[in-house]
């Protein structure tokens, strides 16, 4: 005997209700997974040192010399570098290195051994700066090289401009160095990959924000040279052609100069299409040194002795 129409309709209604409940649970699960994945990526790039993956990164080794001792070295025999930008300035390199004697990392008013990952960046790998510091010291021009890093992965130029999330830290670090008797000699800007990966990012807006950053740094560190690298390379995404010219334009501003063209270091120098592998870290340090050399030579002839 066939099932009554009313019973069949009731069963179909229950089946439909059950299916809808399953779909709601599935959608909720996918939403939670997506949120968790997004928060994980966000945290990897934005949480401060010591809060993600490796607790040892929060305990850098105290340097064998004090801030006061380094501050007593004549300025022509010491160099204070402030490195600013996104992940390629923030310890996201493939291999770690120790700069060795005579090179120091500055953070929160203290000096530490210049060992990757450097304090002030939110990555846990290697950096250009330990390698650059070692090259500068080995050349014999300086008795001490001080590296201060203020860098965070995935940041935009507007994050560093007045009103941005990282601007106060940028200015505060310069004030700390000045108060410690170690005024900044040069500010190395390595940022731009974020905007270069966005098709709708404006070169004009990038230049305007970077101009504000340079102006603020000139106020905080009047004698510092602001050095702008060409940094827009990303193998996985098409490059926005407006950003590199904006960096060139900013390098011509008063108090600024052109740094290295790191876009020449293509996929063979990258571990994942963006961040530097061991070969890339060495090549980037060499490129920074070559770009700084003419200015360093001029600086040595103009500083009071």
What is each stretch, according to the model?
Residues 1-23:
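N-terminal Lys/Arg-rich, disordered targeting/topogenic segments
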Residues 25-305:
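Cell-envelope and extracellular/periplasmic
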């Amino acid at each position: 005997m066939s099932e009554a129409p009313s019973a069949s309709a009731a069963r179909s209604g229950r089946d439909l209700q059950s299916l809808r409940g399953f779909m709601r649970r599935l959608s909720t699960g996918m939403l939670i997974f997506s949120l968790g994945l997004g928060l994980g990526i966000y945290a990897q790039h934005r949480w401060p040192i010591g809060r993600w993956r490796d607790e040892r990164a929060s305990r850098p080794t105290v340097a064998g010399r004090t801030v006061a001792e380094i501050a007593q070295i004549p300025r022509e025999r010491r160099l204070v570098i402030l490195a600013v930008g996104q992940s390629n300035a923030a310890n996201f390199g493939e291999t770690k290195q120790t700069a060795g004697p005579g090179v120091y990392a500055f953070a929160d008013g203290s000096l530490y051994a210049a060992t990757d990952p450097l304090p002030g960046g939110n990555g846990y790998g290697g950096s250009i700066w330990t390698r650059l510091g070692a090259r500068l010291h080995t050349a014999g021009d300086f008795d001490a090289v001080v590296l201060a890093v203020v860098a965070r992965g995935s940041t935009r130029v507007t994050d560093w401009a007045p009103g941005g999330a990282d601007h106060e830290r940028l200015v505060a670090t310069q004030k700390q160095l000045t108060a410690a008797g170690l005024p900044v000699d040069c500010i190395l800007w390595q940022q731009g990959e974020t905007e270069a990966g966005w098709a709708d990012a404006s070169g004009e807006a990038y230049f305007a924000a970077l101009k504000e950053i340079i102006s603020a740094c000139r106020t905080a560190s009047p004698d510092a040279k602001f050095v702008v690298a060409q940094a827009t390379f990303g193998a996985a995404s098409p490059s926005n052609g407006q950003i590199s010219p904006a960096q060139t334009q900013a390098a011509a501003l008063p108090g600024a100069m052109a740094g290295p063209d790191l876009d020449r270091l293509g996929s063979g120098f990258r571990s994942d299409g963006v961040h530097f592998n061991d070969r890339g870290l060495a090549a980037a340090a060499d490129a920074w040194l070559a770009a700084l050399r003419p200015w360093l030579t001029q600086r040595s002839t103009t500083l009071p002795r």
